[in-house]
Amino acid sequence: MKATKTTYKKDPMGLTPSQIVNELNRFIVGQEKAKKAVAIALRNRCRRKRVEGNLRNEIVPKNILMIGSTGVGKTEIARRLATLTNSPFYKIEATKFTEVGYVGRDVESIIRDLVEIAVNTEKTLAKTKVDIHAREKAIERILDSLVGKTSSSETREKFKEKILNGELDDTEIEISVADTTPVGGGSFEIPGMPGASMGVLNLGDMIGRALGSSKTKTKKMLVKDAMAIIIPEESEKLIDQEKIIQQAINLAENDGIVFIDEIDKIASTGSSRAKNAEISREGVQRDLLPLIEGTTVNTKYGPVKTDHILFIASGAFHIAKPSDLLPELQGRLPIRVELNSLTKDDMIKILLEPETSLIKQYSALIGTEDVRLEFAASAIEKIADYAITVNLEVEDIGARRLHTILENLLEDISFEASEMKGKKITIDDKFVENQLSKIITNLDLAKFVL
């Protein structure tokens, strides 16, 4: 049954678990156990906020371990969950980290990045609230450049009307704008640690705040370009930066979701212990322990507590087993959910049912060329058949196999669509077979092409 958008009765605690599952069903096929687990975890957060007194601080989120092969929906479930709740969401692979003391990223950068996302979210929200006022101030600055500060109100009103109507978009003006050239300092990459940066405030920002002003420079530009630069500048002046930072830290601490993928890759199997082939995997696990259990991480915005951040870890566990993780880490991921491998029926549903299904995406893309692309039921079944076959014979990459198959299937149509305006193309099982049968039957070729 096709999942559709539903309007729910207003609940003081937000979406109920069943409503969350219904929303996830709009985008993700199957995996009911995983959806149920994340829905309960999310609802428990809302419940905790309504608990009175000291007991509220004692209630911690029940972190989740998702077990399942690639392409079955682990990441998508967590990502859609964050979108549903407007929560700060950060996804990272466990293999990106090394034990403290070695060259590489340390696990505390997870929280620094999460807070950065929360700050940007709060800042964007605050800017939308002052957008009208910021636009007015931007127009006033442009009018100063166009007609001068001493011009009559009648003249200013006349030119303001022209700006609003877009009549002066291509008029060149000379105007002072903020100088965004880095003064030094700022967040900079640490040598030998790709992706890691020092959590320090921009030196220029600090000097600007101390002096109550910022450096500007005069530039020549078109009115439309000036509007695009000045509106954000004015928005920055109108919003309360300190308040935004406090709200962002609170949002990250109480609503943040961290998704740690490939956690099975840092599990220490017997062979890896004996060979000592990699920098301590156990060390990374031990570094993760306090973060997941609850600690305070210093960021450039201030200290952030991780006690109530929801951690969702996932892994395929083809070689290692969940029991190969440190016992302490296993204890901090109490909810375990096994995601099922995808069947042929699942593949058919993935192609057809989600609101943003692949078939709808490709039809919309080709449709922009005034070409109508349709898929017969027999074609959908054949595509699903081929996806399952290649997953079984080559390597199981789940629903991601559909992307490669459809790209190969529609390659010629995508190339020639611009010369087929007004036509209708129907994809049936014979077309699918003609395009893909040679690749499917030659498994050595399929390994490289599909």
From Swiss-Prot:
Pfam families cross-referenced by the UniProt entry: AAA, AAA_2
Molecular functions (GO terms): ATP binding; ATP hydrolysis activity; peptidase activity; proteasome-activating activity
Locations listed in the record: Cytoplasm
Gene3D superfamilies membership: 1.10.8.60, DNA helicase RuvA subunit, C-terminal domain, P-loop containing nucleotide triphosphate hydrolases
Keywords: ATP-binding, Chaperone, Cytoplasm, Nucleotide-binding
Biological process, per Gene Ontology: protein unfolding; proteolysis involved in protein catabolic process
Domain of life where this protein originates: Bacteria
A GO CC term assigned to this protein in UniProt: HslUV protease complex
Primary localization class, coarse: cytoplasm
Entries under SMART domains matching the protein: AAA, ClpB_D2-small
Binding site for ATP: V29, G71, V72, G73, K74, T75, E76, D261, E328, R400
PANTHER family registered for this protein in UniProt: ATP-DEPENDENT CLP PROTEASE ATP-BINDING SUBUNIT CLPX-LIKE, MITOCHONDRIAL-RELATED, ATP-DEPENDENT PROTEASE ATPASE SUBUNIT HSLU
Family label: Belongs to the ClpX chaperone family. HslU subfamily.
Assembly behavior: A double ring-shaped homohexamer of HslV is capped on each side by a ring-shaped HslU homohexamer. The assembly of the HslU/HslV complex is dependent on binding of ATP.
Task performed by this protein: ATPase subunit of a proteasome-like degradation complex; this subunit has chaperone activity. The binding of ATP and its subsequent hydrolysis by HslU are essential for unfolding of protein substrates subsequently hydrolyzed by HslV. HslU recognizes the N-terminal part of its protein substrates and unfolds these before they are guided to HslV for hydrolysis.
Protein name, entry field: ATP-dependent protease ATPase subunit HslU
Organism listed in the record: Rickettsia rickettsii (strain Sheila Smith)
Lineage start: Bacteria, Pseudomonadati, Pseudomonadota, Alphaproteobacteria, Rickettsiales
